[in-house]
Amino acid sequence: MSNKKADSKPQAKYPVNLLDTPFPMRGDLPKREPQWVKEWEERGIYEKIRAASKGRPKFILHDGPPYANGDIHLGHAVNKILKDIVVKSRNMAGFDAPYVPGWDCHGMPIEIQIEKQFGKSLPAAEVMSKARAYATEQIEKQKVGFKRLGVLGDWANPYKTMNFVNEAEEIRALGKIIEKGYVYRGLKPVNWCFDCGSALAEAEVEYKDRTDPTIDVMFAFAEPEKTAQAFGLPALPRAEGGIVIWTTTPWTIPANQALNLHPEIVYALVDTERGLLIIAEERVAACMADFKLTGRVVATAPGVKLANLRFHHPLASAHPGYKRTAPVYLGDYVTTDTGTGVVHSSPAYGIEDFMSCKAHGMTDSDFINPVMGDGRYIESLPLFGGLSIWDANPKIVDALNAAGSLLRSEKYTHSYMHCWRHKTPIIYRATSQWFAGMDVTPRDDGKTLREAALEGVEATAFYPSWGKQRLFSMIANRPDWTLSRQRQWGVPMAFFVHKETGELHPRTLELLEEVAKRVEQSGIEAWQSLDPRELIGDDANMYEKNRDTLDVWFDSGTTHWHVLRGSHKDQLQFPADLYLEGSDQHRGWFHSSLLTASMIDGRAPYKGLLTHGFTVDGEGRKMSKSLGNGVDPHEVANRLGAEIIRLWIASTDYSGELAISEEILKRVTEGYRRIRNTLRFLLANLSDFDFAQHAVPVDEWLEIDRYAVAFSAQLQTELLGHYEKYEFHPVVAKLQTYCSEDLGGFYLDVLKDRLYTSAADSRARRSAQTALYHLTHGLLRVLAPFLSFTAEEAWKVFQPASDTVFTETYYAYPEVAGSAALIEKWALLRDVRGNVTKALEEARTANRIGSSLQAEVAVHASGARYDALTSLGDDLKFVLITSAATVVKVDDEAQESVDVAASKYQKCERCWHYREDVGAHADHPTLCGRCFSNLFENGEIRSAA
């Protein structure tokens, strides 16, 4: 610190050491923060951090890329600020912790924006050109928002999944997993959005309530004799009747190809007014009530006995096109929780149906698949051709009723799959797609993808720990990954496929590398414009370019390949130490990254996974436009300061929901002010202190100063332990307690008399300032990861010759001999002080004293308390902030008490103590003896406080 005082007020007759500081009481954050952002950028602070960290062990937090579309919202702020706290705290812990931000650039949302602005008929080359420009514009907007929040990083050189080198490396990653044998092409039901016109990833599906028709439908007997035999009857009692299914998707009935029963469930043949009905025995009573029928069980048989029986399609009498029969297959997935215990199977529209029919010998060409990509039936479908499936639902119900097959129809509200972009219902739809097989044995006969990924989960540290089971169960139960998409703005699956067989070209791996080289030079547009003959010559007569693009989750899911080991390999490394995202990313980026790394490397791409919750309002409700309870981080930053957002995030247990409201922000702001006031006190009282010139050796410090430094060092050890485990809210809570109670409520309160009234250059005052110097060093560094603007502002006052607080590491406090015993002793003293303060307050309330300095106290103490109190000698009064203090020994704790009496002496004009020696010097009648000594003689001697 400089030994120059700030401009001081006119000197009083008996001056005290009341110093000022350029660090203002009011933060004026909305005005000052943008100036710091500008200064950090202009002065290259991030680059200076990198230079200072060079050669240290690396710590890599890999940034999960936000999508390059739209303004940043509060969820973005939570995510980026948590990452910033981690990175800054790891740098200060002695690591080289770079932060390379990234953006996810391809995919549907941007393509939709281009369609909205320019229509759907743009040539592919123009779509790509405009998509690139749009993504670039969005990135620049978001970048400004993130920097405004105080996030330091390599903003000049972020990674973008649309950069040519990243696109090229993604194609190479695709080549890697093909080479290993994980990729296959097949017909399979996938999540399909009619509005997207494309398959969806699991992470792009959300569930919302929807009301649909629920129907019970009878499939009439096609083999009455065999059916009778299955139930142990010589013949069916009557010809009418059949087997009954229940479904909430009437639109799948035209595509029915089978019926599924559980092998062990007992099925009943029930005689009713509508004929003989086959229903699970335990569902008979409920179904009869639902169908408003009376029934008598004629016979029963387990499902296994009914296998391979055939029944007529329920629309067989309505149109010749439905004159087919459905076989009974057995499936363990059939239950009797609801419905009839019989499941109708349209294999083109359900994964379990598909697997069951495949297992029973159906080939891809056998599947009836009448729903087109836009959600309409093909024109040739009998009765319903050209209709959208949702419009067809009621017409199918009517047709079933007219055919005599309908037993019941009602409205049913259930949780149903929707597209996360369009918020519209989606279906499973069998299409020819490229898949990564979860249970495929790779060519090296190593572990399957599922096995490798589950091992990766086990090897990963999770924060919080419950994330492990969540990700494990998702991987354990997930279907094969649909890699392909039917879009334009995406990285191509740059294959050449045989026009007749659909087989890959035998030189596929070599060709992928050739395409990657071109993409590296010109982007994915190089594939669009490529004439196949350039690469495969005359083979172009037999092979054509595959038109599918890669799932965007493959884009971001391979950043461990094309960023950590690709575009930014000089700064980053594989595996990353930490991936940090919202808890939805267990099925998103965490998930896709784990799968791709398991295929390419046989391991997880991260050592640790940290998840945070979502933001909610003060009442725990999710933020939504309809509720009008959203909080805009820009608005809060411009009104209260980004520092308040940072402090709110750091002080909240992010493992659950993060609640925010005006009341919560008000409390955060009050907490901020307490920290700021502490810093202001420290800086003001160091403004005439130069460490090189004024520092006092540790062994010459007053005892309370040694205690304060020992206590602060112990606290720092605790805080760094929390930082290491990414536990930020205990860091904030303990620092707020430290500032308000340990410093403001105790140490600094005791120190004021010594700082203000001791001789300016006395050992007593310089001892206090030396301790404050160390405390300030320590405090600013542990605050810096989350209160970045304030710590930097204070640091520039405290260490003006230093570039930035962010190139520092956590402070090495000086060793204090016997620190543990000292901390224990002063904990006792603080406990006694609490009792004294309470007694003083009672005396003040009773009008026996005014301020605490008007009091003289006698503390009755026993044992260790007595020893601790007497060890302070006459300095005890300074600790208790009274004008006099004596200690009386008692036998035990039960006899301990505090006596308070008003001093009978005069008040010193300068120090405000009431002392017998006020006026002892005739020339200075209002001054006490110690103030006279401090001003005109050698000064008082203090040893403890």
UniProtKB/Swiss-Prot annotation:
Positions contributing to ATP binding: K625
Matching Gene3D superfamilies: 1.10.730.20, HUPs, Valyl/Leucyl/Isoleucyl-tRNA synthetase, editing domain
PROSITE patterns linked: AA_TRNA_LIGASE_I
GO molecular function, one term: zinc ion binding
Motif ('KMSKS' region): 622-626
Subcellular location: Cytoplasm
Cofactor stoichiometry and binding remark: Binds 1 zinc ion per subunit.
Binding residue positions for Zn(2+): C908, C911, C928, C931
GO CC annotation terms, alphabetical: cytosol
Domain statement: IleRS has two distinct active sites: one for aminoacylation and one for editing. The misactivated valine is translocated from the active site to the editing site, which sterically excludes the correctly activated isoleucine. The single editing site contains two valyl binding pockets, one specific for each substrate (Val-AMP or Val-tRNA(Ile)).
Protein name as annotated: Isoleucine--tRNA ligase
Organism, as annotated: Burkholderia ambifaria (strain ATCC BAA-244 / DSM 16087 / CCUG 44356 / LMG 19182 / AMMD) (Burkholderia cepacia (strain AMMD))
Lineage of the organism: Bacteria, Pseudomonadati, Pseudomonadota, Betaproteobacteria, Burkholderiales
Gene label: ileS
